[in-house]
Every structure is written in structure tokens, then in C-alpha cells.
Swiss-Prot record:
Catalytic site positions: 57
Protein role: Catalyzes the covalent attachment of the prokaryotic ubiquitin-like protein modifier Pup to the proteasomal substrate proteins, thereby targeting them for proteasomal degradation. This tagging system is termed pupylation. The ligation reaction involves the side-chain carboxylate of the C-terminal glutamate of Pup and the side-chain amino group of a substrate lysine.
Keywords: ATP-binding, Ligase, Magnesium, Metal-binding, Nucleotide-binding, Ubl conjugation pathway
Other noteworthy facts: The reaction mechanism probably proceeds via the activation of Pup by phosphorylation of its C-terminal glutamate, which is then subject to nucleophilic attack by the substrate lysine, resulting in an isopeptide bond and the release of phosphate as a good leaving group.
E.C. numbers: 6.3.1.19
Metabolic or biological pathway, per its Swiss-Prot or TrEMBL entry: Protein degradation; proteasomal Pup-dependent pathway; Protein modification; protein pupylation
Lineage of the organism: Bacteria, Bacillati, Actinomycetota, Actinomycetes, Nakamurellales
Protein name (database record): Pup--protein ligase
GO MF, one example: magnesium ion binding
Record carries keyword Amino-acid biosynthesis: no
């Protein structure tokens, strides 16, 4: 896999069931969740020792943004570390609630929709060169992203006036534009707001907001890995057929509602194509591209899972990937439960099952239970995730940020940090600007730490 700075931002759903008479609003529950963070960070928007950012987003949604990663397994470990960091906050908040006489269980969900129909996102970030034609890259990537849900969707039981049906994606029905500078109002596929968090003369950040939040480590590997490969092909000028859809927003919904992948979707230039055929062509192009430029173990793993997932959809024999792809894992679970208990998809217990798959609490969330029983495949170990909770990626700028935050906290020093700045809030107001996200060592940061 080409070395590239990548990151994942995840907004979590939160709710609380109360045991006593007193009730709290979602806003109040979220504030309890972040009380420990505010006590040491004096804010609900902080950077952690592992280089990540943790904050309370609009609408009472806790959000975790991984540190800059340049390898997929490291990114997956840091994405999973975010779940555990927030789960630790949940345990702390439940203890505080109990101490104050407000008995309650807090539920944190790594999903994309709530029961009221609200949607919250999972955003992928890829660093690209400033010199490239952004519009060309975005236009080339959108058809891939529209069809990618076939291999990387989280799955959802969609309730409608016509009944209930199983869909590929949680996010698809909440996307309203192809490209836009807004993320909450219009919910585009690619966000065009130009915030590189790096040297603006050299870099730009590609901000993809169409993807689902994945519980499965292997699905995250496939989701991000395939996007990185297609992006690399576009940047390298690999000729690809024009799959621009006549209406990308209608296309993303039609594809989500068809688990066979065979729904023909209209193309802007005339004719049509199915998600299965489009993804198969992307896969074949990527396999040829990698064969020509050379492979590595991670790229091989991505291509192998991509091929096997497409074969599973083609044959509708999902046993080849039913521990590796979120929407398939969940569908197998729901189908088995519904058949055992004689339920249809409209039954409330099916909705509960759908939601509980995304509960991040170990031993309660269904995905974590499946993983513990070997029925959900892994990419990284529990030890790697535990390490990622406190140790930043060692080959990117995140290492400098994480080491600075740790040193300042240990020394009891007042400091300010963002993605590119490290600042000691003392009389000298010493500040270091880190414009190169690939750089993991810097004498200026070493001196700043030594001066504490």
C-alpha cells in the first residue's frame, strides 16, 4: 500500500436507561460522559496522549478522530482504541451517576442512525498532493464510493410504510449531495472544505463522509484500503471507465436497498451498470495495477478480501465472508434469530438486535461477543489496541503531538495543541508549527519538551 496519511473520525450515538425517578436529557448524559475529560482538559475538545482528538460534537454526539496513521493496521488499532477510550468514559460516568443517586446504564453505539431518524457520521481522511486536480479526483472517486457500500456497508433494517427490508448501508439514505463544503446540513459524499491540517501549499485533505461506521476490523480494512487503492490509481492516471451516475444520490439509495448488487443504475453518459459490475471492474483494475507496481502483505489482504466479497455477492453464498463483512455478519445474525423465533423484520426484537450489534461495551455488544467466539475476524490484537489507547503512531506527526501532550501533562504544564501547533502557555509562549504530517521527529519539539 502506498504510504499515505489517513485518519478516521467517528461520531457515536449515546443513550441512557434510568433505574430511578430522575431522568437526564441526552445533552446532560453527554456532559456526564465528558466530565472527567473537562476536569483535566478544561474543555470538551481535547487531544490525547495517543495523538487523537476527542470532543463533543453537535447534537450530543461524542466524536473520536484518530491520530494521523500511514499504515492500515495502525489505523484500525487506533480506530478501535477510540471505542475503548469512550467506553472507559462510560464506566466512569455511570459511577458518577450512581454516586449522585441517578441510577442508569449508558449505551454507546458505533452506528449511523438513531430511532428518531437522525444520522451521524464516520468520516475518512486521505492526504493528497495540492498539485492534483481536486475536482477530477473527486469526480473519479464518487462512483466508487457510491458502490463501495456493497463491500463495506454496516447493514441496517430499514423500516418504511411499505414494511421492513434489509439494506447494505446505514448512511446511504441520509446523503444529499455529491460534493459540498458542508457536512451536517447537506451531507455530501465528499466534503470540499479546504482544511489540509498540513502545509497548504503542498497538501490537501480529501474528506470522505459517505461511509458507514464499521464494527468489523476486516470491513474497515476493506473500506479504507480499497478507497486508498482507487485514489492511487486516479492519481497515477490509470484509465478507468466513466461510471458517473445520472443521479448519484438516487443511485446510492437504490444500491443500498439491493443486497444482490444487481440493480441496474443509470449512468450520466447513457446506459446503466450494477454495483456488483462496477465494483468488479474497480477490483480488476486495482489487481492489475498492483501486479504491475508490486504488492505487499496489507495490499494483498485487501485485494483478497475484495475478491472474495464480490464472489460471495455474485453467488449469494456468503459463507466465504460471513465473519469479515459487517452487513453480511449482521444479516446472518438477524436471519438466524428471526427464523428461530418466527419473527419478521418489523418486530421490535429485530430492531433491538440491529442496534445491539453496534454497542461498543465488551460482553454486551453483539459484535464484541461474536469476536470473542471467533465469529468475527480480526486484523489487530487486543494488545495492539490497548497500546494504541496511550501510544501514538510512531511514524507520523502524531508521535510528536502525543509525546508533547504526555510530557506537558506529566510536568503539570499549561499547553495548547491542535493538529499542527504545539504551544506551551508560559511567559515565552513557545510554539512549534508542524506542517509535515509525515515527519515523526523534530529537534524543536525535543527542545520544547526538555524545557519543561
Amino acid at each position: 500500500m502506498q504510504r499515505r496519511i489517513m485518519g478516521i473520525e467517528t461520531e457515536f450515538g449515546i443513550t441512557c436507561t434510568f433505574h430511578g425517578q430522575r431522568r437526564l436529557s441526552p445533552d446532560e448524559v453527554a456532559r456526564y460522559l465528558f466530565r472527567r475529560v473537562v476536569s483535566w482538559g478544561r474543555s470538551s475538545n481535547v487531544f490525547l496522549r495517543n495523538g487523537s482528538r476527542l470532543y463533543l460534537d453537535v447534537g450530543s454526539h461524542p466524536e473520536y478522530a484518530t491520530a494521523e496513521c500511514d499504515e492500515l493496521p495502525v489505523l484500525i488499532a487506533h480506530d478501535k482504541a477510540g471505542e475503548r477510550i469512550l467506553q472507559d468514559l462510560v464506566v466512569d460516568a455511570e459511577t458518577r451517576l450512581a454516586e449522585e443517586g441517578i441510577g442508569g446504564d449508558i449505551y454507546l453505539f458505533k452506528n449511523n442512525t438513531d430511532s428518531a431518524g437522525n444520522s451521524y457520521g464516520c468520516h475518512e481522511n486521505f492526504l493528497i498532493a495540492r498539485g492534483g486536480e481536486f475536482a477530477k479526483i473527486a469526480d473519479g472517486l464518487i462512483p466508487f464510493l457510491v458502490t463501495r457500500q456493497l463491500i463495506a456497508g454496516a447493514g441496517k433494517v430499514l423500516q418504511s410504510p411499505r414494511g421492513a427490508s434489509y439494506c447494505l448501508s446505514q448512511r446511504a439514505d441520509h446523503i444529499w449531495e455529491g460534493v459540498s463544503s458542508a457536512t451536517t446540513r447537506s451531507r455530501p459524499i465528499i466534503n470540499t472544505r479546504d482544511e489540509p491540517h498540513a502545509d497548504a501549499e503542498r497538501y490537501r485533505r480529501l474528506h470522505v463522509i459517505v461511509g458507514d461506521s464499521n464494527m468489523s476490523e476486516t470491513t474497515t480494512l476493506l473500506k479504507v484500503g480499497t478507497a486508498a487503492l482507487v485514489l492511487e490509481m486516479i492519481e497515477s492516471g490509470v484509465p478507468m471507465r466513466d461510471f458517473t451516475f445520472e443521479n448519484p444520490i438516487r443511485a446510492i439509495r437504490e444500491i443500498s436497498h439491493d443486497t444482490t448488487g444487481r440493480k441496474a443504475v443509470r449512468l450520466a453518459g447513457g446506459g446503466d451498470i450494477s454495483a456488483l459490475d462496477a465494483q468488479t471492474e474497480y477490483y480488476e483494475k486495482a489487481a492489475a495495477f498492483v501486479a504491475n507496481r508490486g504488492t505487499d502483505p496489507v495490499t494483498h489482504q485487501v485485494l483478497d478480501l475484495w475478491r472474495r466479497t464480490l464472489e460471495a455477492v455474485q453467488t449469494q453464498d456468503f459463507t466465504k465472508v460471513d465473519t469479515e463483512i459487517d452487513w453480511i455478519i449482521k444479516k446472518k445474525l438477524i436471519d438466524a434469530y428471526a427464523a428461530k423465533h418466527g419473527l419478521d423484520l418489523t418486530h421490535p426484537r429485530i430492531a433491538q438486535l440491529d442496534l445491539t450489534y453496534h454497542d461498543v461495551r465488551p460482553g454486551r455488544g453483539l459484535h464484541s461477543l461474536l469476536a470473542a467466539r471467533g465469529r468475527a475476524a480480526r486484523v489487530v490484537t487486543d494488545g495492539q489496541i490497548t497500546t494504541a489507547m496511550t501510544v501514538p503512531p510512531q511514524t507520523t506527526r502524531a508521535r510528536l503531538r502525543g509525546e508533547f501532550v504526555a510530557a506537558a501533562q506529566d510536568a503539570g504544564r499549561d499547553y495548547t495543541v491542535d493538529w499542527v501547533h504545539l504551544k506551551l502557555n508560559d511567559q515565552a509562549q513557545r510554539t512549534v508549527l508542524l506542517k509535515d504530517p509525515f515527519r515523526s521527529t523534530d529537534d524543536r519539539v525535543t527542545k520544547l519538551i526538555e524545557a519543561m
